[in-house]
Regions:
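N-terminal signal-anchor transmembrane alpha helix
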Residues: 4-33
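Membrane-proximal helix-loop-helix units in multi-pass membrane proteins
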Residues: 97-162
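Terminal transmembrane helical module of multi-pass membrane proteins
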Residues: 140-228
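Interfacial helix-start motif at the membrane-water boundary
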Residues: 47-70
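Physicochemical signature of membrane-embedded alpha-helices that form the seven-helix bundle of GPCRs
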Residues: 8-14, 60-67, 96-102, 124-131, ...
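Hydrophobic transmembrane helix segments
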Residues: 25-50, 225-227
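Cytoplasmic juxtamembrane regions at transmembrane-helix boundaries
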Residues: 76-99
Length: 228
């Protein structure tokens, strides 16, 4: 294992640990408010922290989340550096790194923008989806292509694995995007206040959290290329 491969794995591990810890602690704090248990299927990313106003602890969630996304995006940088060492197409690799950084920043913005500013929140949610789609398209079209030296010609199994994983991620994204319930959003949720009624399954929140999961899983194709 090369140093860059080790750094790639370390960045993913540290980033995931930070995300898990912040979700556990913030989720427990949310439950103590007496509202209900925090659920990824019902509550938005910004709601994990919105109840701690004018508190020093309110800065923990955005700071740790920013650090986590920064470290996760660093994995794409290590992939770009490994590609450069192997004589691959570094331009695409660095573009993927840049897209990952932008995606992380947009998610961090979603942890601040409340539904009281509904249009801005929706703009960032759409941008979050589009950046994830761009990352997957780059993986699908460039990583399995031997002309860009990401995968050596004899490694057909690696090419197939990258294609299948990326295609499955695209299907997951399509399921999140093309949910018929979005058409009934105004009937299901009152959006003119920060405190509102909502269904058991909040599909816009699911779209945001689902794309956060995709943001993490986008590391799988480049991980396959780096190690196989």
């Amino acid at each position: 294992m090369s140093e860059l491969q080790g750094a790639f794995l370390a960045s993913i591990g540290v980033g995931l640990v930070l995300f898990v810890l912040v979700f556990i602690f913030e989720g427990r704090a949310f439950s103590k408010t007496g509202i209900s248990k925090y659920s990824l299927l019902r509550y938005f990313p910004f709601e994990l922290n919105c109840f701690k106003r004018n508190s020093k602890l309110s800065y923990v969630y955005p700071v740790v989340t920013f650090m986590g996304t920064l470290i996760i995006s660093a994995a794409f940088l290590f992939f770009a550096l490994e590609t450069q060492n192997n004589g691959g197409a570094i331009t695409v690799a660095y573009i993927m790194f840049a897209v990952s950084c932008l995606t992380g920043l947009v998610f961090n913005a979603l942890t601040f923008i409340k539904l009281s500013n509904y249009q801005l929140h929706l703009i960032f949610a759409v941008l979050f989806v589009c950046l994830n789609l761009l990352e997957m398209i780059l993986s699908l079209f460039f990583l399995p292509n031997t002309n860009y030296v990401y995968v050596n010609a004899p490694h057909q199994a690696t090419q197939i694995a990258v294609f299948i994983v990326t295609f499955l991620l695209l299907i997951f994204e399509a399921v999140l995007m093309f949910n018929p319930s979005y058409k009934r959003w105004n009937k299901m949720v009152k959006v003119d206040a920060e405190t509102f009624n909502r269904p058991r399954f909040n599909y816009l929140a699911m779209l945001e959290w689902g794309n956060f999961i995709i943001y993490i899983l986008n590391l799988l194709p480049i991980g396959i290329v780096m190690f196989f």
